[in-house]
């Protein structure tokens, strides 16, 4: 006789009530650090033409552009190392401590880029020092986005995780807007000659005060409820084992959660390739290939990004209602179908059509960024969440980070301005496969954590849904048992000796 496993019901005491004040602080601190990360990426992408002339003088303009963007891409090689390092520490000692460390390293390394003398002053050491600073950034960023997304996800109520998580990439886009705006403002005030001489350094100097503010906010945060629950469980069951912190098993990650790892890699590749193509490569594409002035190209991208800021939280809010998968599928299909039309518009040399083409790509990007920060942390349980997510995220970013360099090389080598569109179509297929195979995570507790609600009333509603789900599961199991027993009866009738 098949036996049914008893399901232990939860009570109101098992539901975590999230404090609104702590949630707002967590979102602000996480988003600010993420904004600073993308502020640097935005600045670097928008001043790539200047950096090419400062650190790679004497080379052909095309070579200068590719070399500057290659320096942008090389640090992605070290990001997986940073991800593994900070991920392991984050699962062992907590999320808050690691986020404080990453923002310090990131702000100092960004600030130091502004201090590097030009190639004319110190020769080959100029690009070498630039590369060292970028690699330090890459190491810290390896634990930044994953840690920030986990921090927000573990602080968010289950029914609002999509909306709350969307503010993390709101910070990313805002960082790009700030970086681009600073570049345009400074270059306009000081003129192109002075900007190439010393003005390009100012945006990098701004990173230090931003880092100090971010450190202050993150230092004041408490550990997330989900991680604290995990520590409490370990403390109750294994006080001796807790002395060295919770254990992280990479064997468990690779063998038990390989499907989640692949899903994470696919989603991040689809999102970040589109991200880097639109927000990092397009300014250079507009200026170098379409012969727009640098400021003109940047202003177009700034306008697009400001529009994205308004769409971003709407996507997160809608994902709490309709789920995360529909947005991944919609974004992937739209990217595949509209990549070529978008670049036909961009290459039209008509300002209105260029804007329309970029806007198409921006809305598609919002489909991905609106759900990514809430989707990724839900794929793994608390005790391995940081390590697993950091490993998968940074491996995929290693691929996505090559986008500006690869796109520039493809265009230069083929003399075909449609190559970026073909590249995006390939990435769209990756996103589509990911969307089809991924599991829905909206409105569900994080793995390894109790349900989380924003107030008592919502907690009671969660309990009602929980009991309804249990009753449905019990009915489903009863039907399965009945079907199995019927199959057993038929087999016994066909082979009577089996039941002897």
UniProtKB/Swiss-Prot annotation:
Chief place of localization: membrane
UniProt topology in membrane: Multi-pass membrane protein
Topological domain spans for side Cytoplasmic: 1-37, 87-97, 143-169, 216-260, 319-325, 372-390, 438-500
Induction and repression of expression: Induced by an increase in the osmolarity of the growth medium.
Keyword Plastid: no
PANTHER family the record matches: ALPHA-KETOGLUTARATE PERMEASE (PTHR43528), PROLINE_BETAINE TRANSPORTER (PTHR43528:SF5)
Protein name (database record): Proline/betaine transporter
Species annotation: Escherichia coli (strain K12)
């Amino acid at each position: 006789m098949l036996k049914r496993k008893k399901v232990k019901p939860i009570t109101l005491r098992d539901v975590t009530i999230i404090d609104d004040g702590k949630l707002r602080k967590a979102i602000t601190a996480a988003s600010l650090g993420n904004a600073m990360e993308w502020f640097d990426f935005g600045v670097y992408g928008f001043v790539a033409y200047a950096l090419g002339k400062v650190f790679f003088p004497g080379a052909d303009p095309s070579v200068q552009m590719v070399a500057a963007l290659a320096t942008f891409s090389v640090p992605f090689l070290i990001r997986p190392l940073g991800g593994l390092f900070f991920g392991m520490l984050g699962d062992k000692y907590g999320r808050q401590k690691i986020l404080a460390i990453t923002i310090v390293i990131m702000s100092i390394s960004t600030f130091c880029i502004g201090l590097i003398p030009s190639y004319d002053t110190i020769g080959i050491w100029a690009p070498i020092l630039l590369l060292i600073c970028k690699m330090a950034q890459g190491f810290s960023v390896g634990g930044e986005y994953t840690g920030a997304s986990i921090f927000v996800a573990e602080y968010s109520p289950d029914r609002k995780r999509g909306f709350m998580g969307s503010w993390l990439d709101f910070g990313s886009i805002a960082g790009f807007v700030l970086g681009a705006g600073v570049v345009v403002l400074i270059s306009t005030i000081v003129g192109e000659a002075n900007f190439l001489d010393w003005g390009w350094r100012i945006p990098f100097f701004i990173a230090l005060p931003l880092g100090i503010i971010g450190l202050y906010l993150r230092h004041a945060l408490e550990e997330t409820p989900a991680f604290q629950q995990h520590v409490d469980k370990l403390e109750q069951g294994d006080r001796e084992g807790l002395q060295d912190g919770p254990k992280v098993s990479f064997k468990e990650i690779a063998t038990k959660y390989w499907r989640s790892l692949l899903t994470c890699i696919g989603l991040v590749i689809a999102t970040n390739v589109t991200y880097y193509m639109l927000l990092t490569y397009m300014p250079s594409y507009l200026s170098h290939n379409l012969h727009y002035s640098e400021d003109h190209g940047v202003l177009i991208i700034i306008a697009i990004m400001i529009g994205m800021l308004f769409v971003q939280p709407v996507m997160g809010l809608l994902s709490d209602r309709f789920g995360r998968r529909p947005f991944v599928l919609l974004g992937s299909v739209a990217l595949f179908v509209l990549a070529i039309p978008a670049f036909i518009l961009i290459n039209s040399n008509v300002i209105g059509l260029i804007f329309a083409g970029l806007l198409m790509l921006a809305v598609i990007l919002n489909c991905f960024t609106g759900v990514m920060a809430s989707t990724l942390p839900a794929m793994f349980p608390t005790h391995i969440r940081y390590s697993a997510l950091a490993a998968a995220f940074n491996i995929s970013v290693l691929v996505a980070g090559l986008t500006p360099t690869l796109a520039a090389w493809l265009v230069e080598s083929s003399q075909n301005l449609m190559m970026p569109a073909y590249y995006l179509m390939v990435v769209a297929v990756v996103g589509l496969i990911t969307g089809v195979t991924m599991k829905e995570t909206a409105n569900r507790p994080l793995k390894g954590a109790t349900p989380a609600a924003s107030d008592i009333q919502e907690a009671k509603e969660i309990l009602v849904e929980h009991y309804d789900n249990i009753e449905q599961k019990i009915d489903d199991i009863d039907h399965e048992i009945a079907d199995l027993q019927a199959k057993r009866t038929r087999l016994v009738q066909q082979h009577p000796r089996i039941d002897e």
